[in-house]
Amino acid sequence: MTSSPLLRFGIIADPQYADAEPWALLDRYYRNSIAKLEEAFGVLNGEDLSFVVTLGDLIDKDWQSFDPVLAAYKGLRHESFLMPGNHDFSVAPERLGEVHARLGMPAAWHDFSRGGIRFVIIDGNEMSVFSAPEGTPRHAAARARLDALLAEGAINAKEWNGGIGDEQFAWLEATLARAKAAGEKVVVMGHYPLYPENEHNLWGGERLLDLFERSGNVIAYLNGHNHVGNLGRHGSTWYVNFKGMVDTEKQNTFAVVELYPDRIEIIGYGREDSRTLPL
């Protein structure tokens, strides 16, 4: 096994901050996430990392929740990539179109290269009943898709999941093809899990599984959303679901990911599992 990684980066999933009372039934402690983020940044700032990515659900609800959580991120010395989850759209309807900009994203879906690896951020909220106001064509299309999934008896036919549209899928397909032509390995990141089958999975996620298998260069898909975490392998792709930071009163969870030519090493902190994933 090679001893030096191609690059290292940090992972945080589902801080889901809000100035709200805990939800004891689900073991979620919304206010405590600021202190957990600060603790995580204290550790991550001491590491040599290319960047830190947060896999969605920075907030639980309310536009004003973004202020304290984004202020906490100013304490992170590394480059930060944020993406929305379903809860980040639990804001007033007139604010829905501002969420990506509030998170400082260049676009709802985008890609970048670090250390010879292509990183791709997808937006599984695009087709959802919460990301566009009622009465809009995008909301109506999402409602129709959810109704079709309910009629099929799909286990992920939930209002708190979402999917991607044809334009985004075509962009993803083209991005993977360009990376393959350039000889780049790819890591795709999104909020919603794709595999193994689970009630939290992206609507129509099977299309992405097939695409990744055809492409053959997607070494990993990283996500949050399912707070208990999960792990699977399909084709040559590892599917890693990181645990939710908002869960439990005091225990934290975050990770450092190391990419090697022959493996992925995940160094888990707190409740997050450490893993060695051979490529």
State the predicted function of each range.
Residues 23-25, 64-65, 198-202, 278-279:
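Short, solvent-exposed loop/turn segments at secondary-structure boundaries
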Residues 63-182, 207-217, 232-267, 278:
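Extended active-site neighborhood of metal-dependent phosphoesterases/phosphodiesterases
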Residues 27, 56-59, 158-162, 196:
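Second-shell loop/turn segments in exported
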Residues 32-36, 200-216:
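Short, motif-level signal for alpha-helix interfacial/capping segments enriched in acidic residues
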